[in-house]
Amino acid sequence: MGSPSSSMTEGDVECFSEYMELWIHRLRIEGLRLWLSGILRIQVGLVSMENLNHQLSSCGFALHRDLDKNYVFRVMYSGCFVQLEHGNYVIVLNLLKRVSRFGGRTQKFMMKCPAVLAPPNREYIQCDSDSIQVTREIPVDNWNNELDWSLALRGSLVVALEDSSLIQINVEMHKPNITVQGRRDTILSPVQVFASEGHFLPLKLVSGNYAYSMEATCPNGNTSSSNETVLHIYKRRMGLTKRGGYQNETLSVSSVMVEQTDTFSWTETTDFVQLIIPTSYIQQNKECLSQTGEKLQQNFYKIDAVLTFKETNHKMHWTMENTSPCSELLKSHSVYDDPQKANFTTHSPTWTAERPEIPADYTTNLTPSVSPSTTSTALQTADPDTGTTSMPTPQLKTTEVFNTSTPLSSQEVFSSTLYSPNHNSTSSSVHQ
């Protein structure tokens, strides 16, 4: 099977990392409605697309209208009636097309895409007081072709990779990874999640009909003096997605795991997961030099999290390193020799997230990038009060940021789940 055509006509199928899409003319949509009603044994109506997609989601299907009032039918590779045949995902649609008031004829449409390995699902973020750096694996399409990528900042500013300085971003490509870096005050947008504020990077790689997320968040300011560290993780599919696609898809978190500690809480909004961890459990310090050469101290921490979503078969592996500015004084109570001395209370916020806003100015120079590396361990135990049993996680030993041969553990780490019907948020926690 060859590469997909750049033009989209009836019967053409587009292949992405986790799903395939078929364009259907509005005059043939009645045939799709009848086919869905028959094969799913439900009453399919097109009046409310939101209600319809709620019905279809249990089978991995979705239907959307385009700007010309035609339709795009999306099928997850893990969806109902999708078969794996000779290395391809295949589903056949029998659509009725009326030719008169009294009858019609059936036409078959085959949706077929090459089976692929798990899409790139790791993101490595480095933040300090001045800059942000994001590293991800460079993706290929379903036919294993390399793509010519451009950068899209805030969905509207699109430049070639070699012209990234026009939007105040540095790009380095060291296969298999790509790293982007810029100053926080020029490329990040403020975002409010519940009662806390973070800074969001609205950046994607784009190529033809493909988009690939480089979106990331940095925590707000210096949190080293706070008892709790609040982090925001942007929810999205990590592989190739439809460029300019339908942004109303909501992913629901089914589990969260943190490598460094079992003591944390999480809540989610439509767009973000908010992770709250006792600062004393993760914070470390190291020596640094002032501009005059004086030896000072600075706080830093690293978090490795694994998120599982109900709507996807692939986990999201998220790593954040945050470094505070050099400081002459470090609070002695910020880091405990015994983490059990720290108090931690989980809570359920009652405020919903807003979309990130565009900052008014972005004109400052960039700082040089740093090559990242990953090493993390986690150990979990049984909790006699909750009955939660956890398995130890083996130590990761990697020389590259994204060593796909060493997947992180997907063990469950929760003991309770709270639900707030007024704000559609979930809070879960685990205590050692």
From Swiss-Prot:
Tissue and organ distribution? Expressed specifically by cells of the ciliated left-right organizer.
Disulfide connectivity? none
Which InterPro entries does the UniProt record give? C1orf127-like (IPR027956), DUF4556 (IPR049521)
Q: What results from gene inactivation?
A: Morpholino knockdown of the protein does not cause observable left-right anomalies.
- At the top level, the lineage of the source is Eukaryota
State what protein this is by name: Ciliated left-right organizer protein containing ZP-N domains homolog
